[in-house]
A protein has these predicted regions:
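A short, acidic, amphipathic alpha-helical segment used as a generic capping/interface helix at domain edges
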Residues: 209, 227-237
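Short beta->alpha connector loops
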Residues: 12, 100-103, 168, 226-228
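Gly/Ser-rich helix-loop-strand patches that form or flank binding pockets
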Residues: 15-27, 96, 102-154, 235-278
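Short glycine/proline- and acidic residue-enriched helix-loop micro-motifs
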Residues: 60-71
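A structural motif corresponding to the C-terminal end of an alpha-helix
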Residues: 79-94, 215
Length: 278
């Protein structure tokens, strides 16, 4: 099911973790790693636009633009060189790709040819983003049509998965990749549903158990109540789960615009990787 994995790297503190999770998944699934770094052309476009539209128009010189492009290209090459050394040492199958363009567009386009995307929760400007998820990752999680593993700065060998399940179509799609990953990584799954209605919760959990049965992995179930994002992240933290798996963006866009989405909140608050199923 997972034979190729896209690793989005930018040289930030998250790059090493993206590589480590990629290596772990690649070895478990015998999957090819496609390592991608993007030279962000928006930097040049912003510089020109800001200069032209300013109160006192000042356009950056051609020399400045050329030197900036050269520096970014060299940095991207250095990132890929370091990735190459690590992956060769780990004896993984891999490809390296350096592409210029808007990061969101490039990542989503490259994701069309893989089964899974692994990306850091924040990028090279993380120090200024506080606890908010990066603008690039937020857009990619919405626009990318492939499942994603969103990781933080620390790598932990996965030992158990918390699967958030509510019986919705999006959550149901997450069962497949969660079962597959648990089987390949040889780790158990706990299926968690958030509801104040115990009988409904038990019915939802029975459905998940029945689906996951053929994967022949350890399965446990749990019911919690409260705000979904807080309950899921809190349960994962209290019980020391290493991955949270869930369907992506289950609410209407109108509701998300007003209240925010559970998906975004869980990515922001979680201290462990989040597996988003598409």
């Amino acid at each position: 099911m997972i034979k190729s994995i896209l690793l989005s790297v930018d040289g930030s503190a998250y790059t090493d973790t993206v590589l480590r999770y990629g290596i772990h998944c690649s070895k478990a699934c015998d999957a090819l790693l496609r390592v991608l770094t993007v030279i962000d052309v928006r930097i040049f476009e912003w510089a020109v636009a800001a200069g032209a539209d300013g109160f006192v128009p000042i356009l950056p010189s051609a020399v400045f633009q050329e030197e900036s492009r050269r520096m970014l290209d060299e940095r991207a090459s250095a990132v890929l060189d370091k990735c190459r050394n690590i992956l060769q040492t780990e004896k993984c199958k891999f490809e390296l790709h350096k592409i210029s363009g808007p990061p969101v567009d490039v990542i989503c386009e490259q994701a069309l040819t893989v089964d899974l995307v692994i990306i850091g929760a924040r990028g090279e400007f993380a120090r200024w983003e506080s606890k908010m998820i990066g603008a690039t990752i937020e857009a990619v999680t919405r626009l990318c049509n492939k499942s994603m593993l969103i990781v933080d700065k620390e790598f932990t060998t996965p030992s158990k998965i918390l699967m958030a399940y509510d019986g919705s179509p999006n959550a149901n799609r997450a069962l497949s990749i969660t079962g597959f990953m648990a089987k390949k990584l040889n780790i158990p799954i706990t299926v968690l549903t958030i509801t104040d209605q115990a009988e409904h919760g038990r019915n939802v959990l029975r459905e998940a158990e029945r689906y996951l049965g053929p994967y022949e992995v350890g399965i446990d179930t749990a019911i919690a109540s409260g705000a979904a994002d807080e309950a899921i992240v809190g349960y994962a933290e209290i019980h020391n789960f290493d991955i949270i798996a869930m369907g992506a963006y289950g609410h209407s866009r109108i509701r998300e615009a007003i209240l925010g989405s559970n998906t975004e909140q869980i990515i922001r608050k979680s201290k462990v990787p989040v597996l988003l199923a598409k």
